Swiss-Prot record:
Family the UniProt entry places it in: Belongs to the elongation factor P family.
PANTHER family according to UniProt: ELONGATION FACTOR P, TRANSLATION ELONGATION FACTOR KOW-LIKE DOMAIN-CONTAINING PROTEIN
InterPro entries (UniProt xref): Elong-fact-P_C (IPR015365), NA-bd_OB-fold (IPR012340), Rib_uL2_dom2 (IPR014722), Transl_elong_fac_P/YeiP (IPR020599), Transl_elong_KOW-like (IPR013185), Transl_elong_P/YeiP_cen (IPR001059), Transl_elong_P/YeiP_CS (IPR013852), Transl_elongation_fac_P (IPR011768)
Protein name per Swiss-Prot or TrEMBL: Elongation factor P
Signal sequence range: none
Molecular function per GO: translation elongation factor activity
PROSITE patterns, sorted: EFP
Lineage, broadest ranks: Bacteria, Pseudomonadati, Pseudomonadota, Alphaproteobacteria, Rickettsiales
Keywords: Cytoplasm, Elongation factor, Protein biosynthesis
Cellular localisation: Cytoplasm
Encoding gene (name): efp
Cellular-component GO terms for this entry: cytoplasm
Amino acid sequence: MKISANSIRTGNILVYSNDLWVVSRTPEHTQPGKGGAYVQVEMKNLKTGTKRNERFSSSDYLEKAELEQKDYQFLYFEGNDLVLMDIKHFDQINVPKEILEEKLPFLAENMIVKVEFYNEKPLNIELPPTVIIEISETDPVIKGATATASYKPAILTNGIKVKVPQYLEIGEKIVVKTDDMTYVERAK
């Protein structure tokens, strides 16, 4: 399936130069003063593990790999693998931790994830778009900070650092996007 360079997202698997590449960082859309707009994409080769930066014109179309997607439940870690269970057939599979890379801290026990297969081999794991996590460290609340739109650093219970509004305190639960690790809102 062909997709526009502007539609490329983190986690997409592309067929490029006769190999499978996973987009490992949020693509940067750039509109320079001279010349046409382009998209800067960081990709990782799924066979060799090498990383590469490519620049595509906004008008380019790329081949997105046709993947089979199944829902699995994360059970536990076993060495360097994740043990997942198919929620329909209850079959268990082991998938290397490296597939998740920097998103691994967002994985929680019993979380439902989407596993993408290419020729019956697991290639990618999609986490839910947002997760609820507790703040474990942050600066104290500053009086009168609710009116300003400034942010302060916070460390979550999974070790991830995010910027949060000034009014949030340690122990509060927040919603965080899993694709770019940014604060969304206070959990309800």
